[in-house]
Amino acid sequence: MVGELRYREFRVPLGPGLHAYPDELIRQRVGHNGHPEYQIRWLILRRGDDGDSSQVDCKAEHILLWMTDDEIYANCHKMLGEDGQVIRPSQESAEAGALDKSVLGEMETDVKSLIQRALRQLEECVGAVPPAPLLHTVHVLSAYASIEPLTGVFKDRRVLDLVMHMLSSPDYQIRWSAGRMIQALSSHDAGTRTQILLSLSQQEAIEKHLDFDSRCALLALFAQATLTEHPMSFEGVQLPQVPGRLLFSLVKRYLCVTFLLDRLNGNAEDQDAQNNFIPEELNAGRGRVELEFSMAMGTLISELVQAMRWDWASSRSESSSPIFQPPPTEFFRPRAQRFRRSRRFRPRTAFASVNTYALYVRDTLRPGMRVRMLEDFEEISAGDEGQFRQSNDGMPPVQVLWDSTGHTYWVHWHMLEILGFEEDIEDVVDIDDQGAMVHGGLGVAPPFQHWKPIAQLFAEPYVVPEEEDREEREHLTQAEWWELFFFIKKLNAEERQHVVELLQEFLEGEHVLDFEILPELTVPVELAQDLMLSLPQQLDDSALRDLFNCYVYRKYGPEVLVGKRNRPFVLDDQLNLFRIETDSEAQDPPSQSASPALRQLVEGLGPSGKLLVDLERALSSEAPQENEVKPCLLQLQEEPQPFLTLMRSLDTPASNKALHLTALRILMQLVNFPEALLLPWHEAMDACMTCLRSPNTDREVLQELIFFLHRLTSTSRDYAVILNQLGARDAISKVLEKHRGKLELAQELRDMVFKCEKHAHLYRKLTTNILGGCIQMVLGQIEDHRRTHRPIQIPFFDVFLRYLCQGSSAEVKKNKYWEKVEVSSNPHRASRLTDRNAKTYWESNGTAGSHFITVHMRPGVLIRQLTLLVAGEDSSYMPAWVVVCGGDSISSVNTELNAVNVMPHASRVILLENLTRFWPIVQIRIKRCQQGGINTRIRGLEVLGPKPTFWPVFREQLCRHTRLFYMVRAQAWSQDIAEDRRSLLHLSSRLNGALRQEQNFADRFLPDEEAALALSKTCWEALVSPLVQNITSPDEDSTSSLGWLLNQYLECREAAYNPQSRAAAFSSRVRHLTHLLVHVEPCEAAPPVVAISQSKGRNRSHDWSSLTTRGLPSSIMRNLTRCWRSVVEEQVNKFLTSSWKDDDFVPRYCERYYILQKSSSELFGPRAAFLLAMRNGCADALLRLPFLRAAHVSEQFARHIDQRIQGSRMGGARGMEMLAQLQRCLESVLILSPLEIATTFEHYYQHYMADRLLSVGSSWLEGAVLEQIGPCFPGRLPQQMLQTLNISEELQRRFHVYQLQQLDQELLKLEDTEKKIQVAHEDSGKEHKSKKEDAAGETAAVAMADEEEEEGKKEEGEEEEGEGEEELEEEEERYYEGTMPEVCVLVLSPRFWPVASVCHMLNPTTCLPSYLRGTINHYSNFYSKSQSHSGLEKESPRQLQWTWQGRAEVQFGDQILHVSTVQMWLLLHLNHLKAVSVESLQALSELPPEVLNKAIGPLTSSRGPLDLQEQKNIPGGVLKIRDDSEEPRPRRGNVWLIPPQTYLKAEDEEGRNLEKRRNLLNCLVVRILKAHGDEGLHIDQLVHLVLEAWEKGPCPPRGLVSSLGRGAACRSSDVLSCILHLLGKGTLRRHDDRPQMLFYAVPITVMEPHTESLNPGSSGPNPPLTFHTLQIRSRGVPYASCTGTQTFSTFR
């Protein structure tokens, strides 16, 4: 399941401890496809600390979601009837409390008569005090209105007329009674309340008839109506102060939008019932409701953006990149920048250094001058323009009012370019400067890139981009046309008719047009561009700002046409839009006619400053004329910037007293004009509060300010509410306290502000409700867009989302929360505190304890963290004790916030965290330095604050709705798949459609990367992850849906090679699905995140794969790999069950393994996770085999490898083919490495490798094979075999040197002896001659004897060395003068080489020639001496045991016979005997018959030199040399007669003994763990105890020992293998937190041996022996017999 089923209801997880629960069916509608849809209320439930779920108020937190029948069937079981159909919402009213029909009729008659009487009485008392009967009538009507069955009577339009008359009455009691009636009417349900509000708000010019109290009454009713509809908290976000007049307008727009939305979503019956209450202009037909809703929603967004003042800091994105698909084929380019410059001022490039330029700017710049930013600095970007305000000694020192942000920001001197006053600036473009500005960060659109697939592994991306229709690119989409139509509707009738005529002319009479059918047209892009050229001259400033900010203008506006050659006039037309037309009188600078106090202000405004001059002139007389002031006011309403600049002049320093007084005088006079109340006073009211709070404000200015504010609030109490929201009450109280109450009207102003506390709360709540409701409607439109796949056609929809997402990509660690930083000394170094360079520092200069840093915070910013950066290397300059203080002004920093002791090794010192109060001034005082230092060094300062944006709130809501929508859809799709697995083939197209739709939405509406990534992550977690979980979960038959599909893919894989077959199409769909599910999984780890500067807005590339790579739930890959593993296990298990006995089992298994590996790459790509899952699946199948069957499989693997290694020796094409087969086999064998079967495989491989090395010798291939499959040998026995072989070869080299040394010593002795003999017999020549002849004869006899002996042999063996050595044989071999054979002895350890006792050479003296026996004895002496020299004499001496195993090269005529040691010994007997019986050979060698017969077989074959003759009296027959005349044989060449490899059978006694040994070890492990109980044992300790018990107890049955030889010995790898087996069976268990501890879990049935019991107290077997191997090689040329009789001579 996707979520959690509890009481048969589906719960969708929405976050940590948060989930949604389907609660109620609200309404029903017919969907876009004709099928019914149902709106379900999902409750938001939170999980408490104790794990229980507690329901939150359903009206407080819920989500309304439209669902289809299938989605309700899969998610909302309780809303289904017994027949499985959705239970429709009940249409019957409650019967409880219902009135009788007759009584109800009488009451309805009374209500109608009361309404007529109230209207008549109201008309009679116009202008007089309302009579008591009227009040009584209204009171009775209110009582009737509270009765719910009478609600229909009050829907008469006369009731609305009565309420309107009462609300517009000047008498307070009548207005109060009207409020009582409205509350009574709206007390029944939210729908009625909304209808009443809508009908009242849509009355014509209702604002003119409502005073402050009436408007507040309606606003309070609206707040009550919307409080529970869209609950949303904007805690931590600073909402602007919106006056009641603007709030009421927003309420009207909001109610109209909600009504139209209800008409779109409601039934026809409900709509007919509501029509009586709704104005006629809203009762349009269904066909135009969507258009009206889009226009109304666009109007609401437009007004809301202005009310929230979002348009102040409009940072419009210029380009976009998608998150699912590559960039679109065409995109708009950013608006061309016109670089303005004054030729009077020098640019920065004209100076030799930056410091020189900074000094020039400081000396030249004057307040009011325009400046431009040359480089990016924190939140100010290169190219931003602004007005210079002031400068001081702080850091940064320059304060500029920036146009891009709407507020002041402090920068450095060298960052500014002087543009001068407005009249000095020229529109010129310098090519060099333009390039520098673009490079500095103004930003241009990125170069166009054609789409190409993701360069990983697939031939197409997992989300295929839609192909654009060329015809569609030539016309506007309906959404784009409706956005342009929004502005056409704002034109008057004459201008509208002109647009209709233009369209008719362009379409060449194709349609007979009128204004009503314009929304249905398909408009070409060229025609739309013509319209956009003419619209700016016909729209007011507000609509013009909306036009420039809308999507269609940014995409097709005049700036896009600048580069087109066929439209050369476009640029001039565009520039004309921004040209301020002035008459001839305005050509003179307006500052010359302004008063001295306003001159600087007027100069800063440029040409628009003339409005202030005209306004001041009109108001300068004692009795200003309305006809002179009114035109100025109308102009200020259209262009309010001069008015706002005048009000914000109160925010300048207190030294500008004359300016303040002049501004207050003008503002005071403006209030007397009714038209002036339409100006945006609320937008600059914070400047008045700044002046009021400033401790340096002059008393006269304060008094004038009090007078002005009192007059303004008396004229409109809305501004008293705004002052209350700005905290004016406390500020006035402080001013009164400071001036001891000597300010006139200050007390009255404070009381008036205090009385508006309730209204201020109402305004804040209304602002929150409207904004929350708009967000919910936006989310609803996004949901409809997902469900219907229809484009969103609401104007400014992207604008609203852009403002909601503002701050999502803001860098939190930027120092954007403070205005400036001042220091106690060395102010020129203060900038080093904020340069983010740890190598620079600010150093103080003063007395100890007098150093401080003062931070001026931005208004309203709460410090989240204040950090001081220090360095221990500064020694005595490093701070030791720091005190942080806060204050409201620089003169009142006396509140201690924190005191911190700094440790000597600290680098970052956190001074403040999570403040709950705003402190305008924060001062850091360094009271003491380390080691008593005087001055201090500070490396840096970091100030972190919260993100005052709507993004966190909107992100939470967006992710909640997205998660709920897609998890519900995922559950419905999963239900379809569960009912019919074949529908899984359509899942790829479904997912592609959903992801492509989200990609297009992000590309069109989401402004930056973080917003897009948040949406993408939610989609993957809500849609892909649950689907993967469901389709990979096994059902009743233990097979998952995806597993079934993958099995089908593997079964029809061969047939899929035909592209025309159905199997090919099926396989293609399966691959599309698997590619889609795993495409975003990275092949490599993501690189570490590096803090780099990124472009703002939508210039960044949206790559969903990067997000989903980082944010992809691990459960997706885990479930997919687990499913693939189970599929592979099932496939391999079927193969093992059917083919494990076949002779070609291993080649077929390797082929199956290769197919699975290739299929894994086809389905999932070269991802290690799926390759590992495939191998684990094969391993799981092998683990399911019984022990004997698994032993047979492991023996087959070892046999196959042995055959391929031996076959590769033949070389040529056949040898290369064997190597290829060997490589494929080794790849498939690697899966045995972590399995229990690896021990059995090692046992067989060890046997075959020993026979191979001792029979044909070692090669490079042995080491290469071990290097590749080394992990498959837990005991590392094959590796140890090769290692001991190398050690033995080194001993042989030493033995050779030892022989040479012995020979040199004997030769020296021989020379000495000869010299002594020569001296002794010098006098007796005859006697000397006689002795010399005797010596020569003896030497010749030895040589002859040597010629008759065989020249060499090779033997290898193991066991104990014979203790006696005959000196005669040693002397004979030492003085042997013939060609000595080369003898190589290999000393091999019995711990690693498996040689059975039957191969031991029990009596070497009877089997070897005398001179070879001497060589062996000589080597034994050498080996004993080497042990004594190596310091091993204190240990028990290791003895040599010679064996029959080995190989030899025997010369027989011109042939070289390659034989084994036994065969060599047998051939040597035939040198002197014509025939020899097999029985005598067996008696002489004491070999078993099977060993001897194995050696005789090749010798008596067609290639062998012997014949075996059967005789009745001689058992076994007689061997003799074959006569060449009977059967000619080749006379030359090498003949291989070594017996073939003998392979073991796991079904024989060998395998059963292995099983017995494993059962014995299992029994020991279980017994030992049971003895330790719940305490358990460490795995190392358990292995030690098992080995100790094995050694102490009696040996396993003697049959086991005799058959396995020393293989019956127990090793740690054998114990670990048994532990793995028992863990897999569940007999043992271990905890996840302590995996090294093992515990006994449940009893199992263990096959215990019935021969002998394991008694730990009995004695064990003898210590293991050291086995050795002999190899003999000839040192001379092979001997060729000179006689005619052929004999055997050992060549090697």
UniProtKB/Swiss-Prot annotation:
- Domain of life of the native organism: Eukaryota
Bias kind Basic and acidic residues: ranges: 1319-1335
Identify the residues that the record assigns to the DOC domain, covering every copy.
791-970
Q: Where is this region: Disordered?
A: 1319-1374
Ranges of compositional bias, category Acidic residues: 1357-1374
Query: Which GO cellular component terms are attached?
Result: 3M complex; centrosome; Cul7-RING ubiquitin ligase complex; cytoplasm; Golgi apparatus; perinuclear region of cytoplasm
Localisation: Cytoplasm; Cytoplasm, Cytoskeleton, Microtubule organizing center, Centrosome; Cytoplasm, Perinuclear region; Golgi apparatus
Find the cross-link Glycyl lysine isopeptide (Lys-Gly) (interchain with G-Cter in NEDD8). Answer: 1570
Q: Which InterPro entries match?
A: APC_su10/DOC_dom (IPR004939), ARM-type_fold (IPR016024), ARM_CUL7_CUL9 (IPR056405), CPH_domain (IPR021097), CUL7/CUL9_N (IPR055486), Cullin (IPR045093), Cullin_homology (IPR016158), Cullin_homology_sf (IPR036317)
| Associated pathway | Protein modification; protein ubiquitination
This protein's UniProt keywords? Cytoplasm, Cytoskeleton, Golgi apparatus, Isopeptide bond, Ubl conjugation, Ubl conjugation pathway
Q: Name one GO biological process term.
A: negative regulation of insulin receptor signaling pathway
Q: Where are the disulfide bridges?
A: none
Question: Domain CPH, which positions?
Answer: 348-421
> Which GO molecular function annotation, any one, does this entry have?
ubiquitin protein ligase binding
| SUBUNIT field | Component of the 3M complex, composed of core components CUL7, CCDC8 and OBSL1. Component of the Cul7-RING(FBXW8) complex consisting of CUL7, RBX1, SKP1 and FBXW8. Within the Cul7-RING(FBXW8) complex interacts with FBXW8 and RBX1, but not with SKP1. Interacts with CUL1 (via the C-terminal domain); the interaction seems to be mediated by FBXW8; it is likely specific to FBXW8, but not other F-box proteins.
Instruction: Indicate the family of this protein.
Output: Belongs to the cullin family.
Function description: Core component of the 3M and Cul7-RING(FBXW8) complexes, which mediate the ubiquitination and subsequent proteasomal degradation of target proteins. Core component of the 3M complex, a complex required to regulate microtubule dynamics and genome integrity. It is unclear how the 3M complex regulates microtubules, it could act by controlling the level of a microtubule stabilizer. The Cul7-RING(FBXW8) complex alone lacks ubiquitination activity and does not promote polyubiquitination and proteasomal degradation of p53/TP53.
Please quote what the entry notes about the protein's domains: The CPH domain is essential for interaction with p53/TP53.
Q: What is this protein called?
A: Cullin-7
Q: Which organism is it from?
A: Rattus norvegicus (Rat)
Which gene does this sequence derive from? Cul7
